[in-house]
């Protein structure tokens, strides 16, 4: 049995398809974050991009997400050192720090079901940005570095 690519390759060595498959589809990166100007601490909100499907935790227009005018960021290998804003459970962040994938990750389980069952996605937890006046009222957790 061969070693899975995420255990045998660095992030830089992965193909585009392998890189894309690391995303568990939790939707947490589609939540707006706030940064404390004094401490640079990052705070997550439950305020989501209007393109996020709240049931599937996927972008409603994934192929065109960078041209839709939204603030969607492309995660690229040359920005790995900037991934501290991603959730602690993000495969890009975990593997970039020499850690392993969580047991519920779709690459290990074959589907998103275990991720949703482990309460690791944003399913049922979001409000859309168009419905929010003060994002500070929607802070849900702080990233842990």
Swiss-Prot record:
Ranges annotated as spanning the membrane: none
InterPro entries: Puta_zinc/iron-chelating_dom, UCP006173
Pfam hit, one: CxxCxxCC
Family named by the database record: Belongs to the UPF0260 family.
Record's protein name: UPF0260 protein VC_1058
Xref: NCBIfam families: PRK05170.1-5 (NF003501), PRK05170.2-1 (NF003503), PRK05170.2-5 (NF003507)
Species for this entry: Vibrio cholerae serotype O1 (strain ATCC 39315 / El Tor Inaba N16961)
């Amino acid at each position: 049995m061969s070693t899975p690519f995420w255990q045998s390759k660095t992030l830089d060595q992965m193909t585009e398809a392998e890189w894309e498959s690391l995303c568990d589809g939790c939707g947490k990166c589609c939540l707006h974050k706030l940064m404390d100007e004094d401490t640079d601490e990052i705070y997550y909100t439950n305020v989501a991009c209007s393109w996020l499907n709240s049931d599937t935790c996927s972008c409603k227009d994934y192929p065109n997400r960078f041209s839709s005018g939204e603030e969607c960021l492309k995660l690229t290998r040359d920005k790995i050192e900037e991934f501290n804003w991603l959730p602690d459970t993000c495969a890009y962040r975990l593997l970039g720090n020499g850690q392993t994938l969580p047991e519920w990750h779709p690459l290990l389980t074959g589907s998103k079901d275990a991720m949703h069952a482990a309460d690791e996605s944003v399913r049922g937890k979001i409000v859309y940005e168009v419905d929010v006046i003060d994002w500070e009222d929607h802070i849900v957790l702080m990233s842990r570095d």
